[in-house]
Amino acid sequence: MGFLSGKRILVTGVASKLSIAYGIAQAMHREGAELAFTYQNDKLKGRVEEFAAQLGSDIVLQCDVAEDASIDTMFAELGKVWPKFDGFVHSIGFAPGDQLDGDYVNAVTREGFKIAHDISSYSFVAMAKACRSMLNPGSALLTLSYLGAERAIPNYNVMGLAKASLEANVRYMANAMGPEGVRVNAISAGPIRTLAASGIKDFRKMLAHCEAVTPIRRTVTIEDVGNSAAFLCSDLSAGISGEVVHVDGGFSIAAMNELELK
């Protein structure tokens, strides 16, 4: 019996088998969780249904987090099969491509700023608000962040601001929902080659640098993140809330390791 046996968890953001969300879903399935999934549009529906079936689930629901009505409809549909459940994984982030290249001050626009914060940060609390009455005591909400929330990363630009907003969201949500027995955390994952990451200029160079200077001398995998996510959504982490847990091989704690390469 796995340490998530008896838990019902909704997973968003599965786009391919390279997705961090897929690694999370795999780990949660292995540990006995019953899973449900969302997809953004019809283009992704068949793919997500296939992945869900591989992980023992037939609950696959459409949800566009840019629309409150879509979020409400999704949870209404979920409530027909799960009147109560035990949390969700928010693995959603987006900024227009022209915002993720070059000088931040020159690249950022009012519209790009709004879109990045709406999709990448506000959607997390919007989902929590919509399903609050459905969450069992002991539930856990989890989102995915990145070091760009704390440091200026080349080409990450407005997404760094959106992730900083998301991390603040985690703290405020944890404080607000804690009395109901709901925990809220984030994982700040190291760079991983995913479809989303491919939109960041020079991402391969970032990966190579990270691998060379990270204390464990490798980049993390979706399995690494998945295992940590399963723990954070389980009762094993019952005392952890409002935290941003770095799953990056120690990259975020090191300085000047590049000197060893010269």
Curated annotation (Swiss-Prot):
One of its GO terms (molecular function) is NADH binding. GO terms for cellular component: catalytic complex; cytosol; membrane; protein-containing complex. Changing M159T: Triclosan resistance. Pfam families: adh_short_C2 (PF13561). Changing F203L: Triclosan resistance. Pathway: Lipid metabolism; fatty acid biosynthesis; Cofactor biosynthesis; biotin biosynthesis. The active site is at Y146, Y156. Substrate binds at A95. Changing K201E: Little activity toward DD-CoA and DD-ACP. It is an enzyme of class 1 (oxidoreductase). Inhibited by diazaborines, triclosan (5-chloro-2-2,4-dichlorophenoxyphenol), 1,4-disubstituted imidazoles, 1,4-benzodiazepine derivatives, naphthyridinone derivatives, luteolin and curcumin. The antibiotic diazaborine interferes with the activity by binding to the protein and NAD. GO terms for biological process: biotin biosynthetic process; fatty acid elongation; lipid biosynthetic process; protein homotetramerization; response to antibiotic. The record marks K201, R204, K205 as: Involved in acyl-ACP binding. Its EC number is 1.3.1.9. Changing S241F: Produces temperature-sensitive phenotype. SUPFAM superfamilies: NAD(P)-binding Rossmann-fold domains. Changing Y156F: No effect on substrate reduction. It catalyses: a 2,3-saturated acyl-[ACP] + NAD(+) = a (2E)-enoyl-[ACP] + NADH + H(+); (2E)-butenoyl-[ACP] + NADH + H(+) = butanoyl-[ACP] + NAD(+); (2E)-decenoyl-[ACP] + NADH + H(+) = decanoyl-[ACP] + NAD(+); (2E)-hexadecenoyl-[ACP] + NADH + H(+) = hexadecanoyl-[ACP] + NAD(+). Changing K205E: Causes a further reduction in kcat/Km for reduction of DD-ACP without affecting kcat/Km for the DD-CoA substrate. Has a larger impact on substrate reduction. Keywords: Antibiotic resistance, Fatty acid biosynthesis, Fatty acid metabolism, Lipid biosynthesis, Lipid metabolism, NAD, Oxidoreductase. Homotetramer. Belongs to the short-chain dehydrogenases/reductases (SDR) family. FabI subfamily. Catalyzes the reduction of a carbon-carbon double bond in an enoyl moiety that is covalently linked to an acyl carrier protein (ACP). Involved in the elongation cycle of fatty acid which are used in the lipid metabolism and in the biotin biosynthesis. This is Enoyl-[acyl-carrier-protein] reductase [NADH] FabI. It comes from Escherichia coli (strain K12). The lineage of its organism: Bacteria, Pseudomonadati, Pseudomonadota, Gammaproteobacteria, Enterobacterales. The gene is fabI.
